[in-house]
Design a protein with these regions (language model features):
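Oxyanion-binding and handling regions
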Residues: 1-21, 29-30, 87-203
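DPxDG-like acidic metal-binding loop motif
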Residues: 55-91
Length: 203
């Protein structure tokens, strides 16, 4: 799994869906991500283990513009070279469950927005919905109903929460989401995985 935030680059690996096998690599970066990305990746996973990977997942943003672009290119390249399926999730979708749990949002069909204030004007915001297939479902499932996009203002009548990146917890959730997609055969060819650019890189 490959993930990035505004200032960190993260890798995660899980063997046979065993949570105890989870391995993580988290590194803060300034302007040096491009120079060290491949070296850090090669240190994290050996060529032998790379060939054993049967599924890749990558976060596509919104996050640092260059980081999102670079990690998606890396994930697409690996998927193509070792011929394994790939899926992707927005950074907000990855943190949505954690935010819902923290704020006691459990009601089925309940919706909320996650937003990030831009340096200049406006926000990036995505919409999420609690989704239980069964009334007694103990596992909190959240659907992304609107991909993160640029908006001028937040809806005053909607429930909103500011985006809050947590490298390790979000890596764990990315692994969990990826496993659910694998079990549901919800996978894509590498060509369909693209970075999410709600705004231009200058904002």
């Amino acid at each position: 799994m490959i993930h990035s935030t505004d200032n960190s680059f993260c890798l995660g690996y899980r063997k046979d869906n065993n949570l105890k096998s989870d391995e993580f690599f988290i590194k803060r970066f300034d302007n040096d991500l491009c120079n060290n990305l491949i070296n850090d990746f090669n240190k994290f996973i050996s060529k032998e283990n790379l060939q054993k990977i049967n599924k890749l997942s990558v976060s596509i943003g919104p996050a640092n513009f260059n980081a999102s672009r670079l990690i998606v290119v890396l994930a697409r390249t690996i998927s193509q070279q070792i011929n394994c399926p790939i899926d992707s999730f927005s950074s907000f979708e990855i943190m949505a469950k954690r935010i819902a749990l923290k704020n006691n949002i459990f009601t089925n069909k309940k919706t909320f927005w996650i937003y990030k204030k831009l340096k200049r004007n406006g926000f990036i915001a995505g919409k999420y919905e609690i989704y239980h297939k069964e009334k007694d479902s103990s596992d909190l499932v959240i659907r992304e109903t609107i991909l993160p996009k640029g908006v001028k203002e937040l809806e005053s009548k909607e429930v909103t929460f500011e985006a809050n990146y947590d490298d390790k917890e979000d890596l764990k959730e990315l692994l969990n989401l990826a496993n659910k997609n694998l079990l549901n055969s919800n996978l894509h060819p590498w060509k369909k995985v693209l970075p999410l650019y709600p705004i231009s890189p200058i904002n």
